[in-house]
Amino acid sequence: EELLRIEIESLQGADFDVSLTGFGEDEIADLFAGDGEKDVKDDDFDVDKALESETFVQPGDIWLLGRHRLLCGDSTKPEDVLLLMDGKKANACVTDPPYNCSYSGGTGMTIMNDKWGDSEKFCQFLLDAFKNAYENLADGAAFYCFHSDAEKCNFFNATVNAGFHYSTTCIWVKDTLVIGRMDFQMRHEPVIYAFKDTAKHKFYGDRKQT
């Protein structure tokens, strides 16, 4: 049974239609029933207490994660981005900036710079960050920016004014809708696709993507 579960799990990961195996949905569900709860051991870790503790990470700290570098810093400050890049240029930038809307999760914690209120200040905030991205990208590098429809003008203007060549807007279609206060509930997220046109841009797909 364990081997069967492993095989079906690998087929699911390969987007294979597992119904072709001859097992019905109920049989497969029974096979995986309780699998997520098995071997789960609770500990005495206090999440709330940990969140209240003073952090030892300070601005300017860089964490090395294998080949990757993670900076505690400000992407609107050129000196911070230069510190992160360490003299190198990136081949692509994928960014998901604040959407200029207040968000608070179940913990009540908020996101810094998440809500500006003033549209001009928010656009300048984006522009400062995007300019730094532009300066630290290689010639022809791609730029992807997840954003909200409500602020699409600011995101578009900041992208173009930073120097990028706007190409198109991709749509991320999500598996489920996101409940909000809007009349129509969103089930997608737009993504600006642009590139640094100081050289022919590089695209690594087969041009069949939608």
Task: Label the model's feature ranges.
Residues 1-210:
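Core catalytic lobe of class I
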